[in-house]
Amino acid sequence: MRIAIDIMGGDFAPKMNIEGAILAAKELENVKLILVGDETHAKPFLKENLPNIQLLHTSEIITAHDDPVSSVRRKKNSSLVIAGKLIREGKADAMVSAGNTGALVAMGILIIGRVQGFERPALAQLIPTYDGNDVLVLDLGANIDAKPENLIQYAKMGSIYVNKMKGVTNPRIGLLNVGTEKGKGNELVRTTYNMLLKEELNFVGNVEARDVLKGHCDVIICDAFSGNILLKSFEGVIETFFSLFKKQVNKNLITKVATLALLPTLRSFKKKMDYREFGGAPLLGIKGVCIKSHGSSNSTAIKNAINQAQKLVANNYINFIK
């Protein structure tokens, strides 16, 4: 198995990408990792000579400020584009990038190609729920201006994903909305609701944002605008919770001592809700395994994203969705 890593993408590139790849290479000894990027920037961080790591030099970088579509077409020797070409040419089985989301989606469509029957790809993420399981939420950032037909396709992609990757039979599909009643929401969600009723899917109705983590659904679909706000709200709430908790703990000796008993539970909870532990968001609907990592990913997040890519390839997900 071969996994390409766009080492020039993300806020802390290439350092964190390379360090994450080294961590993954030690865990996945039978997987070849192809580090795609500028060798001048990369070599100072390649301090270990591992047999399953290869550096592939590229001379261009797609930045966070570049226009997604034009940069993919113009910067043909960028790390992101070359990583995508490796998949298209059968030289890599998967790729990981923490770079420009729009460019990643454009690359997925223009270079790797869409799966027949799916008009638009979607970024998906498994989010922990109260009952200890996960809910797959999509789209989280690939297609801001979605149509009802796109959301129906997301439901089908998500259903296949949780069935094949998690073994969930007849996955429950929910539609993110401002209320649970039929007829709630804007035209997009109302039309999608009525269309879902006619599909051979286990559609359980509308789901409000406050109920996403309650485990009532296996898959929740939404447009990328709503999904991205939902995901970043979760991240912000968790970060704020622990910041406020830390301030309260340090108020006096009693709270400090009491907190010692809670530390194992708090650490476990924080780890479970930490986006760095999730790995990344697979771009579903394209003809290859492509994982989008958080832009501010550290080495642990990159390592977990690579592990996630390896599992998707090992489980033959692409052939199932085709």
Regions found by a protein language model. Give the residues of each.
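Extreme N-terminal starter segment of soluble prokaryotic enzymes
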Residues: 1-4
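Short beta-strand segments
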Residues: 6, 35-36, 56, 97-99, ...
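N-terminal glycine-rich anion-binding loop in soluble enzyme alpha/beta folds
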Residues: 13-66
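Short glycine/serine/threonine-rich phosphate/pyrophosphate-binding segments
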Residues: 13-18, 76-84, 88-90, 94-108, ...
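Glycine-rich phosphate/diphosphate-binding loop of Rossmann-like nucleotide-binding domains
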Residues: 13-15, 28, 32-34, 39-40, ...
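Phosphate/nucleotide-donor binding subsite
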Residues: 50-92
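Glycine-rich phosphate/nucleotide-binding loop
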Residues: 109-123, 129-133, 137, 216-220, ...
